[in-house]
Structure formats: C-alpha cells, structure tokens
Amino acid sequence: MAASEENSALFPIFILTIMAIPLVPYTMVKLSGALSKKQRTIHCQCLECDRSGKYKRSLFKKISNFSTWSNLTLVLLWVVMIFLIYYTKNMSREAQVFDPFSILGLEPGVTDSEIKKAYRRLSIQYHPDKNPDPEANKYFVEFISKAYQALTDSVSRENFEKYGHPDGRQGFQMGIALPQFLLDIDGASGGILLLWIVGVCILLPLVIAVIYLSRSSKYTGNYVMHQTLSAYYYLMKPSLAPSKVMEVFTKAAEYMEIPVRRTDDEPLQKLFMSVRSELNLDLKNMKQEQAKFWKQHPAIVKTELLIQAQLTRESGVLSPALQGDFRRVLELAPRLLEELLKMAVIPRTAQGHGWLRPAVGVVELSQCIVQAVPLSARKSSGVSSEGISPFLQLPHFSDAVVKKIARKKVKSFQDLQEMRLEDRSELLTQVAGLSATDVEDIEKVLEMMPSITVDITCETEGEEGIQEGDIVTLQAWVTLKRPNGLVGALPHAPYFPFHKEENYWVLLADSVSNNVWFSQKVSFLDEGGAITAASKAISESMEGSGAGVKETNDAVREAIEKVKGGSRLVMGKLQAPAEGTYNLTCFCLCDTWIGCDKKQALKVKVLKRTRAGTRGLVSDEGAIAEEGMEEEDEIEEEDYDDDYESEYSEDEDEKKDMDEKRGSKKANGSVKQKKESSSEESGSEEE
C-alpha cells in the first residue's frame, strides 16, 4: 500500500512534465511573435478613417484581441502548471529520500560528538517532554530518532555510507505514476482504468475528429463552401460583363444561410427605393423588372440590397437587425470575391486559359465594395475609363465637387494626382469649396495611394527564342511605391467595417481573345514570406540554367534587396502556343483601390518548332522574318488596345454593340497609346 501511495504522489509530476513539453515552446513562440510585431502605423490617418473606429485600440478592443481561445487556453494551462508546481513542491515528506545527515542538519563525515550535539539540540526542540505538539512528536520519533540511530550505530552508518540506506542494499522499485484509486486492485479500479484509457485515448479523439470532419467537409481551404464554388464555376461565363458579376456573386451558399425575417420586409422595401437606380432595371418596363427582382430567392434579394447599401453608402438607414446581416455580408465578401476571381481565371479552354472579362469585373466589384462607390460611377466619361469613381474614394468628395474641379480642366484622377501640392490645395479650397482640414485629409489619402510598375519577361530557360510547345518561364517584378514611403499598408476604406489588406492580381492575358494565360495573387504586407519565396524561386531558376554557386548567391542577394525595396517576384510556367505573334497585356489589378491598376504591354513571338538538333538556334529565315515583320508590328501597335476599359455602361444585348464598342475603344485609345509607347518599346525588346 505504501508503494502505491508513493507512486500516486508521482502522478502530479508526470502530468506536469507532459504539459510542460508542448506548453513552454508554444508560449515562447507566442511571446516572440507578440514582441516582434511592428509598431509602425500602416493604416490611413484621415478623419473619416479615424471616425470609423476600426483602428482605435480601446480597452475593450485590447481585451477582446487578447481574449482569443488560444490565449485563454494558454493562460488556463499555465494556471494549472503553477498549481501543480506548488503542489509538487509541498508534497508529503514521505516521498523524500531518507538522509540522516540532512535531518540532523549536519554535513556528511562529521564526528560522533557533533552528531550527539545536534541530536541534543533537536531533542530540546522536538522531544515530547519539551514540545507537546503531536506533529513535533511524530517528527521526532520517525525522523530524528531514526537518523540518530543510523549515524551512531556502526553497522547502520556503514550501510548508509555504502548503499545510501541504513538497512543496507535496497531492491529496485518501479511504479506507475497514476492516482491511488486507479491502483486499488481490491476495488473496481480495473474497470475504471480501462474506461479511462478507452475514453481518453480512443473515444475523445474519435469524437473530435468526427465533429471536425463533419464541419470541414462543407468548406474548402479558404473557408468557402464547396456548394459556393460549384455555383460560381457553372454560373461564370466568358462574356460576363462587369455589371453582371453581382448576379453571380450573390449566389453564394454562405449568403443563403443568412436568415430572412418577416420584419425585414418593410426596411428592405425602403432600401430598394433608395438603390433602385443601381439595380440595372429596365426603365421602360419598370413594373415588370421590379416584379422579376422580388421573385428571386429572398436571401439573394436581401444580399444584393445590402451590398447596394454599401455601394451607395446608405447603410445608416438600416434597422438594427439588418445591421447585423449587413456586417455579415461584408465580412464574407473579400474571400468570396477571391474565390469568384479564381473561378474566372481557372483553365477553361483547350489551351488551359481562363477568362479575362469576368476576372476584371470581379476585381472592379471588389474595389467598389471596399471603397463604397456605386458601380454606375465607373461608366467611362470619354477622358477616363474609370469615370468619376476614383474621385469618390477620396474623403469629402462628391459628384458636385468633381463637376466643380472639372471646369478647371481636371478631367481625370491622374490630372489631380500630378498637380503640385500648392496648386491642388488652391483648387480644392477656392474652386471646390473645401476647408483646409478637408484638404489635409485628401492629401493624407493621396499619400497612401500606391503606384505600381511591372517589369515582365517571358523566355524559355537555356534557349534562344520561344518555340511552340516550349515550357515558358514568366518572371515579373511588381514594384509598389507610395508618396509616404510605406510599402505594406491598409487602404483608406472608412465605409468598410473590417480590416482589409491590399491584394494585387497579376494577370497575363490576351485582351482580344479574352484569354488569361497566367494569374497570381501578390501581397506586400508579408516581407519575410516574400523574401523566402523570391530566394527559393531565383535559386531554383539559376540552378536549372546551370549557373555557378557564386552567380546564384549574387542573384539571390539582388532579389532580396529588391524585395526589401518594395518589389515582389512573380514567377510561373506556361506552355507556348502555336507559332505566331501574340500581343499580350500584363494586368496588375488592386482589389481595394480604384484607379491604381497597371497594364503593361508584352509582345511574345513564338517560332515554329525546329528539328531536335537545332532547338537552341534561331534559323536565318526566322531572323529575316523578324526583320521583315518590324514594320508590320509598328502598324499593329497603333491599333493595339492597351487600356481595358470598364464596361458598366453596356446593355444586356452585348453582341449587337460589340463592333461599335471596338470602334470607340480605338478612338479613345489613340491618345493613351502615345503615353504607353515606352512600355510598347520595352515589350518589343523582349522578342
């Protein structure tokens, strides 16, 4: 029984050890991550963003940010750890090793006179005749007397010095660090131990696995339902106009789960009257169009109206119940739009290409939702393909302000950005009638807006020229600069109630055939991850081309410096198409800012497949053909559409207006082509 009690006393130590093995490293990782967080402000500092409250770190927010499940679990485990440490430290002395020298307060090897002197001193303190305390009596009999006997008896002392115990050599004893009730073989401990093992080691993990799998089976890795991806895949069309993307977007299964209450009917009717002009309804048959709109699934109607409330900035009139649904719709929007974009660029054609037109529409819808700008504001105005939408994302700007500054020949958003600070301040105060504080807010937002440049190349590694069927390596450096010097930052989005990171989508596409050859998402917030990815990609590319160690290290070092300077590397592989010249466009589309997209022309010449022995050479006829095609290429460049305009002003009958649209694009694009001549020349150098 004593042995079982001793083993039971070891059970807290066993639990303490098992808990400390994962808990201590995990705590160190959490603390290092918390201490390494940058304190630099990366969000907008204008008054509108400040009033939104999403960046304010109040006491409640600090507590809520700390009170996550992982942090609370961590604190609870440390409380248990501290309790076990205290309990272990104050365990019964019966579990301690018998050491007569330490009991008498002596050092090993002392003389008999010192032993007797120590015994007399302790007897005065603990002897029953001197101290009536029962605990003192017990300690004197069980420890002090035995220790004195072990050290004064010659045989006992010799055994202690040789074997560490007064009784001589002791047998080796092993036990199980389990509670005593589980080691009581006379009772029902066998069944309890069996139930404990089965419950903790088998049933508990099984129940957790079943619950996790039953919930996760409905979702993908991006926490989007499989049903949503299926709907997006089948509803996506190659000719889907940006104005029609909303109809596909609202078909998400997550939005179908938002409850539709009878009390929502009247508020939704009022909201419908406020946003009716943004719903693409036919004005000639308004009654029929309204009836058709309300015949849709109630969840779809509710979702679309709530999104329109965000686009038109009418969320303030929503009832408290609809406010919760409104926040839920916007909370799901970023990841649903990302998956919708992936469904647009997923390989559809025989050549493995996606569709450009719906992809651009998804990005434009994302921009409008984040900036709370109506889709109708994106209608091209002749000078700007984005309409007045870039102006409306600035604080204190409205349609009236845009009309006022347009009288001073500020026709496009680029004109406003390129003005000198003094001229812009004078324009906004004297012409637009804004206050000095309003102008200061506008300047803060303009300093936050990114400027993107793209340097892209396509080549076959280790070969001269690209031949049909080759595996082509695409390499693009996307560089971001802001007037305030930040690289990674959160956008100005005072009407979007959640934190939204800037994401950029790099699309290599053929605007004429509506094909997307390559797509990849780029983020500028994670510099460490970008350095790791760029180093790995450059290293593999250099090693594949047969470069030496020094050349590889130099290339990796150069790539790291570029990443630290605000660039991100985009690399991918694609198969070369049939022989011909392809006028491609590299789109770099931002999903948060309007008017910050970048389009870079890229001309790719694919040569005819030659015999196996001459793969790396360009034939003389090919060189002559290239020289002869230069004049023809110059003519083609004049007609090349380098600016993929927004198409929210199109009607449903798109096929009938296609020829007129192409003609208007050529007319409006002639002036822009001169501005992009440098990019065309850089594209021709990649031939």
From Swiss-Prot:
Gene3D superfamilies: 5' to 3' exonuclease, C-terminal subdomain, C2 domain, DnaJ domain, Sec63 N-terminal domain-like domain. Its main location: endoplasmic reticulum. The keyword Protein transport applies. Residues 30-65, 212-687 are cytoplasmic. Induction: By tunicamycin. Disruption phenotype: Male gametophytic lethal due to defect in pollen germination and pollen tube growth. One of its GO terms (cellular component) is Golgi apparatus. It is a multi-pass membrane protein. The keyword Chaperone applies. PROSITE patterns: DNAJ_2. The chain crosses the membrane at residues 9-29, 66-86, 191-211. SUPFAM superfamilies: Chaperone J-domain, E set domains, Sec63 N-terminal domain-like. Interacts with OEP61/TPR7. Required for integral membrane and secreted preprotein translocation across the endoplasmic reticulum membrane. This is DnaJ protein ERDJ2A. The gene is ERDJ2A.
